[in-house]
């Protein structure tokens, strides 16, 4: 692979390409992606797959209350932060993209899509992107791809986005990636994938920026792995709600949230453990004991954990009941 890239760089340099873009800094994220907005929730997202390592660290950009960006082909990462800044200043996706394209000497090699908080989408495919390369832009979305095996990838993505309109935005985006791969996908194969989702309103704190931020940097089946991670992420959303209920002293609500998480991710000992803790705190110790026993049989560390929960108040049963649990 390294030799192939060196040869390609030499060829591009000989044709004057290096004067148009910085060949040493431009990554080969030839790929397929979608930028989209949920018309009901206002959430915005980017989903991407490529036969390139860690595609999510290059292609996908987003800011709550502003918009999302996908920058690919011979990637100029500056389209991400610059595009978001322009849209935050009030420019539409189309105007922001047009301005940055006009300033880019390497635009012939770029493929970029912008989507703003109002659902306006705009995309650009440079004339020197590797075929098959195209884009389709519609209400609240844009799908784009380059270096595809066939010319059916992009139409399949657009069709899938419309088909799965009843799904939450994140799940809908994954279905679009699946459709792209089923239509042939990247001519080189599969390696990495990513998904980000941001909200419709500006946030105060950096850690609130992403509702979902998942990356599969190197995997034989990156889309399938991304789909699995999304399911796990959804389960942990219920775990987080359970934690908040514990903080609020609402043990019945915590038990409800932990139980839902466990149903979604039944192989997780941790989810079983916190459900059992919530049950014990809610006066259901006898019902919790069989769950604790199964957990301890699989991993003794959880037995040790029981004693550590007393001081911070995460386990509120009596001292004798703590001993009962630890003896299971």
Where are the predicted features?
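Short coil turns that delineate tetratricopeptide repeat
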Residues: 266, 300-301
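Canonical tetratricopeptide repeat
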Residues: 274, 308-309
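Alpha/propeptide regions of enzymes that mature by internal proteolysis
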Residues: 19-188, 195, 217-250, 259, ...
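Register position in tetratricopeptide repeats
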Residues: 247, 281-282, 315
């Amino acid at each position: 692979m390294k030799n192939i890239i060196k040869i390609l760089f030499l060829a591009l340099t000989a044709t004057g390409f290096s004067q148009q873009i910085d060949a040493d800094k431009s990554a080969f994220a030839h790929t397929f992606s979608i930028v989209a907005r949920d018309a009901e929730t206002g959430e915005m997202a980017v989903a991407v797959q490529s036969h390139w390592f860690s595609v999510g660290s290059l292609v996908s950009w987003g800011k709550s209350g502003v918009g999302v960006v996908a920058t690919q082909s011979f990637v100029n990462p500056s389209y991400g932060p610059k595009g978001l800044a322009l849209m935050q200043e009030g420019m539409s996706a189309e105007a922001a993209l047009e301005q940055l394209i006009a300033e880019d000497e390497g635009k012939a090699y770029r493929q970029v899509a912008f989507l703003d908080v109002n659902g306006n989408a705009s995309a650009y495919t440079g004339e020197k992107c590797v075929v098959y390369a195209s884009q389709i832009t519609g209400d609240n979305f844009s799908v784009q791809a380059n270096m595809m095996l066939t010319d059916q990838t992009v139409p399949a993505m657009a069709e899938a986005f419309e088909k799965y309109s009843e799904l939450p935005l994140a799940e809908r985006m994954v279905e679009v990636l699946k459709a792209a791969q089923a239509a042939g996908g990247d001519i080189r194969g599969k390696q990495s994938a990513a998904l980000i989702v941001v909200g419709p309103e500006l946030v105060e704190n950096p850690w609130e920026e992403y509702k979902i931020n998942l990356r599969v940097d190197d995997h034989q089946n990156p889309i399938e792995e991304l789909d699995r991670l999304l399911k796990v992420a959804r389960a942990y959303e219920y775990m987080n709600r359970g934690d908040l209920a514990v903080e609020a002293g609402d043990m019945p609500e915590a038990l409800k949230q932990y139980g839902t998480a466990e149903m979604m991710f039944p192989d997780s000992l941790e989810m079983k453990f916190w459900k059992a803790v919530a049950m014990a705190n809610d006066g259901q110790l006898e019902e919790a004991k069989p769950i604790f026993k199964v957990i301890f049989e699989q991993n003794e560390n959880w037995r040790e954990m029981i004693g550590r929960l007393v001081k911070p108040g995460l386990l509120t049963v009596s001292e004798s009941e703590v001993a009962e649990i630890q003896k299971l």
